[in-house]
Structure formats: structure tokens, C-alpha cells
């Protein structure tokens, strides 16, 4: 299938983390395959594979295919290197093969993935975006906190956003996710919204992928 408009690779990987934590894949190699791969960019695949520690697997793997070669060309890799990558992976049996057999399979329909958040403590604690408000109230109802900050004219209470970060090697390597964050920020500015003084804003850069 294909993800709905507005749903990102981050939503997809949080769904996968939730599913695979329930399944139990500790110590296993997880390969992602199926018809839906043709609708996932290499950046989206990298987002999923890079979250292997979160879903507990030894590694998350996408077989090399034409999308991989397309990405190498897009990022101006040397043509000799690209040819070597394709030849090597075909010889080594790492090229995508629809005839492979697997010990176990978990099915996921991409069109069913919804916008979501995870937390507040564990990445597998996924909650649909539309239910975050109720979920937060339920989580914090028995934890009343209010603290006056010395030398400042505000009080802190449970639920205040004190850190707003677009971070991790997963998020900052995916251009679609960064563009989405930029569009949300622009819309907030257009509506006259801005972060309060005690919220720390950060956007660390990442290495070349």
C-alpha cells in the first residue's frame, strides 16, 4: 500500500516499533519486504532501519534495489562506485529477491498508518495524534507539579514544553520530515505563535548520508 497524505516516515517507524515490540524481535535480523516498498524512498527506509535498537532487533534490513541505485545517483556518487555497488550486491545475494523464504512474517498495511506520537518514556508507547490530549491528561493527573522559577516572571507546571528539538540521526537525515517540520513552523509563525521564553529550541545538524 501507500501512506496517506500527511503521514510521515516517523509515524511509520513508531507504528513498526510498537508492532515489533509486541511481537518480540530481540536478537533477530528483521528484513522489510513487500509491494509497499516501491512507495518508500530510501530516506524513509533508512529511518526505519536506523530505529532497530528501538524495536529491539539486532538489525533492520532493506535489500538493495533500484531505489538504492537511484539514491546513489541523486547524491552524485561516482559512476564506477555505483556500478560496483550493484554488481557486488547482486553477486552476494543482497539484491532484492521476491522469492525469499522467511522464518516468520508480520504484516503491515501502509495505508493504515496514522499520524502519531510516542512516549512519554518509551518509543513503543505509541498514541494516535488525535488522542494525545486525553493521553497526556491521564498520564499526568496524579502528578501535580507547579514550581516558581527564581529571578523569572513565570511558574513551571506539569505539561509545560521546556525543550523543542528536531534531533536524532533518524529525523535530521530525512528531508521529507525536515520539510514537514519547516511547514509546521511556518504555519505557526503565520498564525502569530511563538515559543515562550523558557522553551529551549534546538536543531542539530547531522552527517552526510
Specify the residue positions occupied by each region the protein language model found.
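Terminal amphipathic helices with adjacent charged low-complexity linkers/tails
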Residues: 40-48, 53-136
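Short glycine-rich or small-residue beta-strand-to-loop segments that form or flank ligand, phosphate
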Residues: 31-35, 162-169
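Conserved small/polar residues in nucleotide/adenosyl-binding loops
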Residues: 199-205
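Alpha-helical support elements that line or immediately flank enzyme active sites
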Residues: 5-7, 53-57, 171-189
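Secondary-structure transition/capping motifs at alpha-helix termini
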Residues: 20-27, 55-60, 78-80, 185-197
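Catalytic alpha/beta core of large soluble enzyme barrels
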Residues: 1-37, 50-51
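Structural signature of cysteine-dependent C-C bond-forming condensing enzymes
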Residues: 17, 131, 137-158, 186-196
Amino acid at each position: 500500500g501507500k501512506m496517506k497524505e500527511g503521514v510521515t516516515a516517523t509515524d511509520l517507524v513508531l507504528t513498526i516499533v510498537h508492532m515489533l515490540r509486541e511481537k518480540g524481535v530481540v536478537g533477530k535480523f528483521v528484513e522489510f519486504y513487500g509491494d509497499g516498498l516501491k512507495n518508500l524512498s530510501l530516506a524513509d527506509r533508512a529511518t526505519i532501519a536506523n530505529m532497530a535498537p528501538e524495536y529491539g532487533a539486532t538489525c533492520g534490513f532493506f535489500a538493495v534495489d533500484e531505489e538504492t541505485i537511484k539514491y546513489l545517483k541523486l547524491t552524485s556518487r561516482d559512476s564506477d562506485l555505483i556500478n560496483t555497488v550493484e554488481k557486488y550486491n547482486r553477486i552476494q545475494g543482497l539484491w532484492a529477491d521476491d522469492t525469499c523464504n522467511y522464518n516468520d512474517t508480520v504484516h503491515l498495511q501502509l495505508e493504515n498508518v496514522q499520524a502519531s506520537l510516542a512516549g512519554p518514556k518509551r518509543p513503543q508507547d505509541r498514541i494516535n495524534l488525535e488522542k494525545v490530549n486525553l493521553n497526556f491528561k491521564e498520564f499526568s493527573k496524579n502528578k501535580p507539579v507547579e514550581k516558581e522559577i527564581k529571578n523569572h516572571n513565570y511558574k513551571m507546571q506539569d505539561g509545560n514544553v521546556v525543550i523543542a528539538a528536531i534531533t536524532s540521526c533518524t529525523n535530521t537525515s530525512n528531508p521529507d520530515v525536515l520539510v514537514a517540520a519547516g511547514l509546521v513552523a511556518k504555519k505557526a509563525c503565520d498564525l502569530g505563535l511563538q515559543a515562550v521564553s523558557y522553551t529551549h529550541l534546538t536543531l542539530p545538524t547531522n552527517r552526510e548520508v
